[in-house]
Design a protein with these regions (language model features):
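Interhelical loop/hinge segments that connect adjacent transmembrane helices in multipass membrane
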Residues: 16, 21-34, 152-170, 224-228
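Short runs within selected transmembrane alpha-helices of multi-pass transporters and secretion channels
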Residues: 10-11, 56, 75-101, 105-125, ...
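Specific pore-lining/lateral-gate transmembrane helices of multi-pass inner-membrane transport
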Residues: 1-110
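Residue-level signature of transmembrane alpha-helical entry/exit and packing/kink sites
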Residues: 72-76, 164, 168, 172, ...
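Membrane-proximal transmembrane or re-entrant/amphipathic helices at the cytosolic face
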Residues: 160-161, 181-237
Length: 237
C-alpha cells in the first residue's frame, strides 16, 4: 500500500530527504530546485526499477508459493505496476511538498481525486472487470495529483513555470517505458521450472534496467549527485 511505498522511498532517499526540511528556511530557490530535481530523479529510478521487478516476478513468485490457480491476469499486473510506479514518483513530490508546508494550495485535490476515481472505476468495471478499478485509480491520479502537486511546488515555492518539469517528466516516462519494454523482451525467452524462471528473471531485472538507465543518464547532473550519495551511504571510495 501507500505506507509501504513511502517507507521504501524514504529509506532509499534517506540522505536527501534528511536535508529537505532544512530547505524550508532558505530563500535560495535555485538550491531548492536542485534538491527537488535530485529527489525526483531518485524516486523515478527507484520506483521504475521496483515496478519492473514487480511486473516480471510477481506471477512466477505467486505460482511458486501458492500455485498456478492463483495467478493474476497479465493486464491487471501491468496496471498495478504502473500505478505503483506513478505513485512512487509522487512520493518524492509529496516529501518535498510536506517539508515546505504547502498544504493549503491543493486542499481540494483529494476530494476531486476520490470523486473521479469512483466515477471512472464504476464506468470501466463494466467493460474491463476488476482491471477497470485499477485503471480508474490510474486515471484519477493522472487527472489530479500528478500535475497539481508539482504545480503547487513550482508556483508557490520555486516561483517559476512548471512547464520544464512536465517536459522532463514526459522524457522520464518515455525512457522508462523503453527500458521496461526491453526488460520484458529479455524475460520472454525464459521458460522452464518456475523456480529457475524466477531466479533468471530476478537476475535480468537487477542488471538490464539499471544498465540501460545508467547508459541514458550517466552524463547528467542528477546521476552524478545520485552516485555521490550512494557512495556516501555505502562508504565506497
Amino acid at each position: 500500500g501507500d505506507v509501504y511505498k513511502r517507507q521504501v522511498l524514504e529509506q532509499a532517499l534517506l540522505g536527501v530527504a534528511a536535508s529537505v526540511g532544512n530547505l524550508g528556511v532558505t530563500e535560495d530557490k535555485e538550491r531548492v530546485g536542485k534538491v527537488f530535481d535530485q529527489l525526483f530523479f531518485m524516486g523515478y529510478w527507484v520506483f521504475g526499477f521496483a515496478g519492473i521487478c514487480l511486473f516480471e516476478m510477481l506471477n512466477p513468485f505467486v505460482e511458486l508459493a501458492f500455485g498456478s490457480q492463483y495467478l493474476f491476469q497479465r493486464e491487471i499486473v501491468l496496471v498495478l505496476c504502473i500505478n505503483f510506479f506513478i505513485n512512487g514518483m509522487r512520493r518524492a513530490v509529496l516529501i518535498f511538498k510536506e517539508s515546505m508546508g504547502l498544504f493549503w494550495y491543493d486542499r481540494y485535490k483529494a476530494v476531486a481525486e476520490a470523486v473521479l476515481n469512483l466515477v471512472i472505476s464504476v464506468l470501466l468495471v463494466t467493460y474491463l472487470g476488476v482491471a477497470g478499478v485499477f485503471v480508474g485509480t490510474f486515471c484519477s491520479t493522472v487527472l489530479t495529483s500528478v500535475w497539481v502537486e508539482p504545480y503547487v511546488i513550482y508556483k508557490y515555492r520555486l516561483e517559476r513555470p512548471v512547464t520544464g518539469f512536465f517536459i522532463k517528466y514526459a522524457g522520464y516516462l518515455g525512457v522508462m517505458a523503453a527500458v521496461w519494454g526491453i526488460t520484458e523482451y529479455c524475460c520472454r525467452f525464459i521458460s522452464g521450472q518456475v523456480f529457475f524462471v524466477l531466479v533468471l528473471r530476478l537476475m535480468i531485472c537487477l542488471i538490464v534496467p539499471n544498465i540501460l538507465l545508467w547508459l541514458v543518464y550517466r552524463k547528467t547532473v542528477e546521476w552524478r549527485e545520485l552516485w555521490s550519495l550512494l557512495k556516501r551511504i555505502v562508504k565506497f571510495p
